[in-house]
């Protein structure tokens, strides 16, 4: 083969690079004082390491999950004093704040013209709920024929250390059953075996769940010794039509992480949900900064759950909104806009005097119509 001067030049250049590398390979080995198993290159070998092209690296703020924390879970109520009495007397919540708000900023935030709201925050353990009564305008009740597989279904899961005592407390206070009674999930279901659960309803027909984890399941804090019957809120659950579509919203855009999965069916699950033939794909998600989880309930069967009403408003009693704290509301709003998710608010809305504990917020619907309130403190 005939070598051109250019070819010879490239060969000489290659030899000049390979020679020091060969020497470096012969002299490699852990240096005295270096960590065990970590190989430190001699200086001559470092000098000839190939240069790596500059790659763009996202800043810490850009790469951080959009949602920092699940702050609380909100629901609309018809009679605030009645709801406060129910949640405090029956379930041991404590009132933290009680405020009335009105004005154009809140109208734009909530998507309801002419509103006046009474908003009460109540805590149970480390977690909180936010109850909102619309003094004006009044909204519609929960549909009387609602079922647990309809896609406007949402509940909070309240943890107890003693299901029998918890059920007795609920019966003494004549709560409305949504399950036939407490259910213990079967041993064959590895991810849910031994969990005890019961669905019931508050005075406005909101679904609630009381839940007891067996040893080895659930957050460690639910197993600490306590003299309290009700300990806190583990998660809020929502019915979804398609888990993968919901993951694109909650995981891929909002940055929540999958914490667990399960597929539940059988007579215990049917009587818990009070849906014959219920077979559920369950996916639990968590925010990096803590707070209650968000749990998807996808009914693989039956598939006759109804979609959420398209004209649902925040003043309706079947309205829930889960409050999510974000670090950069504008960045999240832009991402949601480009992916065509449905806004309740016209965009990020600044609210006066941080009356509800945040400076700006927006309401957005997930693929099934569940509302998330994104707030920037």
Predicted ranges, named:
Residues 1-9:
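Bacterial N-terminal signal peptides that target proteins for export
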Residues 8-19:
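Bacterial N-terminal signal peptides
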Residues 20-24:
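Sec/Tat signal peptide C-region and signal peptidase I cleavage site
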Residues 25-65, 68-78, 118-131, 136, 142-231, 238, ...:
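Vicinal oxygen chelate
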Residues 76-127, 172, 188-192, 239-293, ...:
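Core segments of cupin and vicinal oxygen chelate
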Residues 81, 85-101, 136-137, 146-152, ...:
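Extended intrinsically disordered, low-complexity coil regions enriched in Ser, Thr, Gly, Ala
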Residues 139-140, 206, 304-306, 370:
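Short, charged/polar, Gly/Pro-enriched secondary-structure boundary elements
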């Amino acid at each position: 083969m005939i070598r051109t001067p250019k070819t010879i030049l490239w060969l000489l250049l290659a030899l000049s690079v390979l020679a020091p590398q060969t020497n470096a390979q012969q002299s490699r080995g852990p240096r005295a004082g270096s960590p065990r198993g970590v190989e430190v290159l001699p200086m001559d070998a470092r000098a000839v390491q190939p240069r790596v092209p500059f790659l763009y690296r996202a800043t810490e703020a850009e790469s951080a999950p959009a949602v920092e924390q699940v702050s609380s879970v909100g629901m609309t109520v018809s009679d605030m004093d009645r709801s406060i009495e129910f949640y405090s007397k029956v379930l041991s919540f404590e009132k933290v704040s009680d405020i009335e708000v009105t004005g154009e900023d809140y109208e734009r935030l909530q998507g309801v013209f002419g509103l006046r709201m009474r908003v009460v925050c109540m805590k149970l353990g480390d977690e909180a709920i936010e109850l909102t009564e619309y003094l004006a305008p009044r909204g519609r009740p929960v549909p009387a024929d609602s079922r647990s597989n309809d896609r406007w279904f949402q509940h909070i899961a309240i943890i107890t250390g003693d299901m029998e005592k918890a059920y007795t407390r609920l019966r003494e206070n004549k709560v409305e059953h949504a399950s036939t009674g407490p259910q213990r999930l079967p041993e064959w279901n590895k991810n849910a075996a031994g969990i005890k659960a019961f669905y019931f309803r508050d005075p406005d027909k909101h679904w609630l769940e009381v839940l007891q984890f067996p040893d080895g399941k659930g957050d460690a804090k639910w197993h600490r010794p306590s003299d309290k019957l009700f300990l806190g809120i583990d998660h809020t659950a929502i019915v979804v039509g398609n888990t993968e579509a919901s993951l694109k919203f909650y995981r891929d855009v909002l940055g929540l992480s999958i914490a667990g999965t399960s597929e539940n069916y059988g007579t215990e699950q049917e009587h818990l949900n009070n849906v014959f033939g219920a077979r559920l794909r369950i996916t639990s998600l968590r925010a990096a900064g803590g707070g209650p989880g968000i749990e998807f309930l996808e009914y693989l069967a039956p598939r006759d759950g109804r979609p959420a009403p398209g004209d649902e408003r925040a003043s309706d009693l079947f309205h829930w909104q889960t409050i999510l704290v974000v670090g950069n509301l504008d960045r999240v709003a832009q991402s949601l806009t480009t992916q065509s998710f449905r806004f309740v608010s016209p965009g990020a809305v600044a609210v006066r005097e941080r009356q509800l504990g945040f400076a700006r917020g927006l309401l957005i619907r997930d693929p099934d119509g569940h509302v998330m309130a994104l707030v920037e403190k």
